[in-house]
Structure formats: C-alpha cells, structure tokens
Amino acid sequence: MAPTLDSDSTVLSIRSDFRQGRVQRQLKSELYRNDNRMSVENDFRAPYIQLPYPQARLNPKTTECMNITFDWLSSMGIDKQVDPSVWQAFVASRLSDIVGYSCNEDIEPEDFLWLCKFTTWLFIFDSMMDDGHWAENICMSSHAILEMNLILMWNDPENERLLECSKSILDLVMAIDASGSRLQLDKFHADMVDARKKSKSLLDVKMGVFTSAFRDCWMEYVEDVPAEYTTRIAQTFQRYISSCLWEEKNRKEQAECMNVADYVTLRRFSGCVEPYFVYVDRIIEHKRRKSPISHIPNTLFYGEHMQNMLAAATDVICWHNDIFSFPKETIREGDKHNLVYTVFQQYNCHSCTQAGELIVELLHDRIAEMEFAYEKLRSAAAPEFHPAIDVYIKNCRDWISGSHEFHMNSSRYNVRSFSGPPENVKHINSV
C-alpha cells in the first residue's frame, strides 16, 4: 500500500524513493485534510515558496531582445507554423522574461540575446510537441527530433558520448513508429555519412522550419566555444529530445502515471534546463577576452560533485515548474507528466495542494544539496578553476530565483491562489 500524508514518515518515505535524503520536516499546511482524497479536477492552491536567494529583477535589456527575438523567429518562418492567435499568445506571454529575470546586467549582450532567442524557440517547440499538431503526428515530431540530433552530431560525428546518446534516440524513434520512421532514419544515416566525410556544410542540409532555427542557434554557439566543450551542451540537448520521445511514447501507449523515481529521472531531461547551466562555458569563453579564467576541465565537469550540483539545480527548477504549470498542463490539458500529479497519485495525498507542499519540502532539500555539492566541488578543485566554478554556481542560483520570479509574474501560468502565509504572497517575496 502506498504511504499517505497521515503518516509522519511520508516526507522520509518519498525522499528515500528517489534519493538519499534523511532529514524529516513537517508539512507547512494541513489544508483539505479529510477522509476523501480530492480529484485532480478540484481547486489547486500553489504552495508558498520562499527561496534562500535575493529576489530577481528584470534585466532592462529584456524588451529590446524580446522584440529582436520575435523578428528572428518570424524571419525563420516559425510564425507561420502556428495559428495567428497562438502566435499572439506567445508574444503576449513575454517568454524572454525568464531570461531577463535570470541573467544580471553584467552578462554580455550577445549571450543575453542568444538565450532570449533559444528560450523563446524552446517554449514554442515544446508547445508543438505537447499540444500542437505534432502531438497528433508522431512522424512529424520524430522527423524534427532526428534533424536536431543530426545538428548536434555534425561537428563531431565520431564522439563516443554523442554516439551513445544518439543510439538511444534512434532506438526510441523505432520503438514509437517503426514503419513510419524508416525513411527518416535512412535520411539521418545518409546525412551522417556526409558529416563524417565533411563533404558538405551543415547549412547545405535541407531542414524543417523549427530545426533550421535551432541550427542557427547551434552554429552561433559552436563558433565561440572550443570543440572539447561543445560536447557537454550537445549531450544536454540530446537528453532533452530523447525525453520528448519518451513522453510521446507514453502518450501513444496511454501509459499510467510513472512512479516518482522514474518521473524524476525523466523530468530532469524533459525540462531542457541543463543547457542553461552548461551554457556557462560560452559565458566563460567571453570572459576570457577581458581577464584570465580557466574552463572547468572534463575531469571535474563529469565528476561526482559537479554532476550532483547540476542535477540538483535542474531538479529544483523542473519541480518548481511542475507546481506552477499544474493547473494549466494537468488540470486543463490533461497531461500527466507532472510531479504534483505523480506524487498525488502514488502517495494517496488528500489533495493536489498537499502534494505540491510536499514537493516544496523536497525542493528546499535539493537546494541544500546543490550548495553542498558546490562546496565539495570547490574543495576538490585546484584554485585556478575556482573562478569558473563560482560562475557556474552563480548561474544556477540566478536561474532558480529568476525562474521563480518569472512563474510568479507570467500570464503563461497565471497562478493566483496560494497556500501559505495570509499576507500577499508577492509582497512577502519582495521583502
């Protein structure tokens, strides 16, 4: 029998399911405690979240870069891929604001603009995968994902790390639509031959509208970052598109809700948060123009402490997003890929609100674990790498606080009901 919130061991039980947390804390609220579990359709009150970092402020460059971004997307033809009303909704949502809240004024203008462009593209791409016409057309979504994989493989087609990720992507495409994907896979392999032979440029490969825009961002990134470091961000993108396929496979098979452990693993990649942390390599490269700073070597980057730090930061942002997106994506749109829904189902919570409150407890634990991993990483590293490590952790903290401020203010989520202190939540958050 699954544990329930009546048990004092609930927090400990759920932690032990998917990580090694051992500290137990009391839930902050007992809202909706009664003999009957509330259905998912009932009112959800987002738990009050207070982060241990300063409140994020919107970068004054945001509106200018947002306008440039939508002009760029229009020039790539993406505005013609969605209904006019949907396009206007994307514009009104000010999707670049998440970058504006997460990146301070000291960021280089070219980095800020790149992040605005990629982020807005990502929101639209993700919507196409979840509820656009791609959601009903597996052939189209698989084709886009194979093209993205080709882009990521192009510069280093024999890289073992990338080949391993690529194999899992190709296997998933076959598992989802074996007959319909044959021609697409044949084209992918033919294009990979060209990549290995260097017989033509990546720009010469014919691609769809969305993937052409992604290629534009990718080529700008690899022009600036040494080849030995581009593999890092390429892997994060591969994990993201692989998770998109997993979600699509689950929808096709009408799979039941995953357990918490499996969901957390999938969510770590499906949120496409990792690239924002690894993008720091380009920020560091730009800093090197002005002052000496060493990149984090692969021995440290792929080491236990660095990976623990990045995984914890990724979990924090993804779980936080699940709380705020729950009314929109799960209650209204019926998407079960949400941690609130998963915890609600697996742990027999009395309400979705209580499931959200439990997740906040875990979220604060993950922040503490991120900070602990940072201290361990810094202690283990030579002093010459400390500045780069500090840039990485600052970026993690900034994206956590910036993402929170974006979710609090964005019309995309429009959460207005909170379980927490009786005072105005935004007022408390700004103190």
Curated annotation (Swiss-Prot):
Mg(2+) 1 binds at residues 126, 130. It is an enzyme of class 4 (lyase). Gene3D superfamilies: Farnesyl Diphosphate Synthase. (2E,6E)-farnesyl diphosphate binds at residues 267, 328, 412-413. One of its GO terms (molecular function) is metal ion binding. Catalyzes the conversion of (2E,6E)-farnesyl diphosphate (FPP) into the sesquiterpene alcohols (-)-alpha-gurjunene and 5-hydroxy-alpha-gurjunene. Other unidentified sesquiterpene alcohols found to be catalyzed by MTPSL4 may arise from carbocation reaction intermediates along the catalytic cascade to gurjunene being quenched by a water molecule, yielding formation of the alcohols. This is Alpha-gurjunene synthase. The gene is MTPSL4.
